[in-house]
Amino acid sequence: MLQLIKKDILFNWKWALLLVLVAVLMPVLFFIDREETRFILWVYIIGSVLANSHFVSKSCYMDDSAQTRRFLASLPVRRAQLVAAKYLLGFLCMVASIGLTSLSSFVLGLYPSVQGALIAFLYLLLYYAVFLGVFFHSNYSNAEKTNTALMMLTIMSVFVLDRTGLRLDEMIIEPTYMLAGLGTCIMIFAASLFFSVRSFDHFQVGDSR
């Protein structure tokens, strides 16, 4: 499975580099308003979305071709491992992007936001659950449309939250909300993985979907 992840990184190293750059540089854009804690929250939300919106997506794009599918089918790995590798790649990307954003914020003196990091983590669990679920159940084209819709929904949500003044960062830090949100997102992510494995197990190489 690690070899599959290594393959994705090597074949898509430009997008992996973009993920790193966005995660590191996003706090710089908000450095001018370092006293406003709400902006620190948006650093995590917008930064994590932008950082994670292309790397795994381009990896799925490569795997959606008939030639790549034949190659993957010839590997001595189970199809469940092929699916799990994509979900693990997504998980590693979200951890890396949030970690790099936190480090960059700390260096700039913005002080990493626990609330922002947690909200970004919960969002990305849902993001990959939906995107990868659509990819393995359908195809890359539909998954990419879903990716665009999720991006637009996120931007609209940030705008609405900012306009209404709803302190999502204060709500999510409450133990009840935090545990409920974390548990729900993990279950959705796990369910997406489970059903994607079942769907891909019945997929025949060469199918056009």
Task: List PLM regions with ranges.
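Hydrophobic alpha-helical transmembrane segments of membrane proteins
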Residues: 1-67, 83-209
